[in-house]
C-alpha cells in the first residue's frame, strides 16, 4: 500500500510475484482496516507518528540496515521507538519550483518569506516538513511567518496550483518535479546552496503482517541498472 507518486514507478513495476502494489490516498486518510489488510506500507517521512510505534513491527532485515549511509542512520536515530520499524528506501531533496525567474532563483530559502509572495506559496501538507523548512530559515518565530505566506498546504496538488497561476512558488521533492521540468521549459526547480530538508520514502511492516521484507527487491532498487534510472527520476538510494 502506498500513496501515488511516493514509490518510483520503475521500482514498483519490479515487484516480484505474488507481491502487488495498491495505490491509496495520502497516509492520513488510511483507515485501520486498510493497514491491517496489507503486508507492507510505503510512505513519506512527513507522516510518521512516533507515538504509534506499536502499529508497526521490526523491519528485521539486518543485511539492508547495514548498508544505510550516515544520513539514513541519522534519520533513524531521530525516530525513537520507530527506529527499528522503519527502512529508508530512497531520498530526494525538497526544492522550490516556480516559473523561471533569475532574481527569484538567486535568493535561496529566504525567498519563501518574500513579501511579494505572501499568499502565493504552496507548502507541504505535513506539519513536520513545514517545521523543517522553518529551521532552514533560522527557526524561532520564522514558523508563524512562513505559515502566513502560504496559499495552502497541499503538496499533492501543488503543481496544479502553480500551473493555474494561483501560486507563484511551490515546495516539492525533486522527484516530483523532474517530469514537469522536462515538459515545461518555463519552470525552474531550485535547490539552495545552503542545503535542503530531505524527503524520505520509507518502508514499514504493519503489526499484523506475517510477510518478511522482500530484500532482493529492495536491493534491486539500490543497485544498477535500476539505481541509475531512479537517480534520473530524482531519487537517491540511501546507502554507502
Segments from the language model and where they lie:
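Alpha-to-beta junction loops
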Residues: 18, 34-43, 117-119, 163-172
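Periplasmic-binding protein-like
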Residues: 120-126, 220-239
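Short beta-strand->loop
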Residues: 58-68, 86-88, 182-197, 206-207
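Early extracytoplasmic/lumenal segment of secretory-pathway proteins
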Residues: 1-52
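A bilobed periplasmic-binding-protein/Venus flytrap-type ligand-binding module shared by bacterial periplasmic
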Residues: 95-102, 198-214, 229-230
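A structural signal for short loop-to-beta-strand junctions that line the ligand-binding cleft
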Residues: 38-40, 56-95
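Flexible hinge/capping segments at coil-to-helix
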Residues: 103-117
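Ligand-binding pocket segment of bilobal, Venus flytrap-like solute-binding proteins
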Residues: 45-50, 122-192
Amino acid at each position: 500500500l502506498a500513496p501515488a507518486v511516493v514509490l518510483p514507478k520503475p521500482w514498483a513495476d519490479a515487484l516480484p510475484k505474488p507481491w502487488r502494489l495498491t495505490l491509496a490516498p495520502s497516509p492520513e486518510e488510511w483507515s485501520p482496516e486498510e493497514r491491517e489488510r496489507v503486508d507492507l506500507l510505503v510512505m513519506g517521512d512527513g507522516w510518521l507518528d512516533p507515538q504509534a510505534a506499536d502499529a508497526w513491527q521490526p523491519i528485521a532485515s539486518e543485511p539492508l540496515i547495514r548498508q544505510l549511509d550516515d544520513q539514513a542512520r541519522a534519520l533513524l536515530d531521530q525516530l525513537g521507538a520507530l527506529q527499528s520499524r522503519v527502512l529508508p528506501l530512497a531520498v530526494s531533496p525538497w526544492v522550490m519550483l516556480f516559473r523561471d525567474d533569475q532574481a527569484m532563483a538567486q535568493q535561496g530559502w529566504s525567498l519563501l518569506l518574500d513579501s511579494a509572495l505572501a499568499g502565493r506559496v504552496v507548502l507541504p501538507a505535513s506539519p513536520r516538513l513545514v517545521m523543517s523548512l522553518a529551521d532552514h530559515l533560522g527557526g524561532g518565530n520564522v514558523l508563524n511567518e512562513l505559515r502566513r505566506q502560504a496559499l495552502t498546504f497541499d503538496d499533492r496538488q501543488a503543481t496544479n496550483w502553480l500551473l493555474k497561476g494561483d501560486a507563484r512558488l511551490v515546495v516539492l521533492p525533486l522527484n516530483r518535479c523532474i517530469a514537469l521540468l522536462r515538459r515545461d521549459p518555463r519552470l525552474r526547480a531550485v535547490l539552495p546552496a545552503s542545503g535542503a530538508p530531505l524527503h524520505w520514502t520509507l518502508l514499514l511492516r504493519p503489526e499484523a503482517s506475517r510477510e518478511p521484507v522482500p530484500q532482493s527487491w529492495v536491493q534491486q532498487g539500490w543497485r544498477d541498472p535500476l539505481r541509475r534510472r531512479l537517480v534520473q527520476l530524482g531519487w537517491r538510494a540511501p546507502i554507502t
